[in-house]
């Protein structure tokens, strides 16, 4: 991970912050996530890689008027899950294909080293995707 990620986001957005933040981290990093969210922006939490709990700066949350949504498949039925997946495919695949969205790749492992890749992921030592090559 890059300790200066918040500074990088603010630099890229000319200090305005992002309209939408897809948050895989939460936990102890949530206040940093709010700091890079545009005023009246939205944070959608889809993971808790930095912890399931943490302190929240409610003043920052209120002052920035951030809309926060938590997302989990654990409480959805199969039809809801299928609908979400289909909508994500329609929105994300074209954006990925056109280069509008780029996914950071942390590491590429040969398939026969999948245990090492899994260990890295389990230890939360990556920033971005871990790819297995065939």
Where are the predicted features?
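Short acidic-hydrophobic, aromatic-tinged amphipathic segments that line or gate anion-handling sites
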Residues: 1-4, 108-113
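Adenosine-nucleotide cofactor-binding segment
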Residues: 1-29, 81-83
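Alpha-helical elements of Rossmann-like donor-binding domains used by nucleotide-donor carbohydrate transfer enzymes
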Residues: 8, 20, 32, 87, ...
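Conserved functional loop/turn residues at catalytic and ligand-binding sites
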Residues: 13, 17, 25, 60, ...
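C-terminal capping/lid region of NAD(P)-dependent oxidoreductase domains
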Residues: 15, 98-107, 115-134
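Glycine- and other small-residue-rich loops at beta-strand/loop junctions that grip anionic moieties
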Residues: 19-23, 46-47, 106-107
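Glycine-rich phosphate-binding loop and adjacent beta-alpha segment
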Residues: 28-100, 133-134
């Amino acid at each position: 991970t890059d300790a200066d990620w918040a500074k990088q986001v603010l630099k890229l957005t000319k200090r305005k912050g992002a309209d939408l933040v897809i948050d895989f981290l939460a936990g102890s990093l949530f206040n940093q996530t709010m700091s890079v969210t545009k005023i009246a922006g939205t944070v959608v939490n889809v993971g808790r890689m930095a912890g399931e709990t943490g302190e929240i700066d409610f003043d920052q949350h209120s002052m920035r008027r951030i809309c926060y949504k938590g997302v989990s498949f654990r409480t959805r039925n199969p039809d809801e899950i299928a609908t979400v997946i289909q909508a994500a495919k329609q929105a994300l695949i074209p954006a990925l294909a056109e280069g509008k969205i780029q996914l950071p790749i942390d590491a590429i492992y040969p398939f026969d080293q999948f245990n090492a890749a899994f260990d890295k992921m389990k230890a939360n030592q990556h920033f971005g995707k871990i790819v297995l090559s065939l």
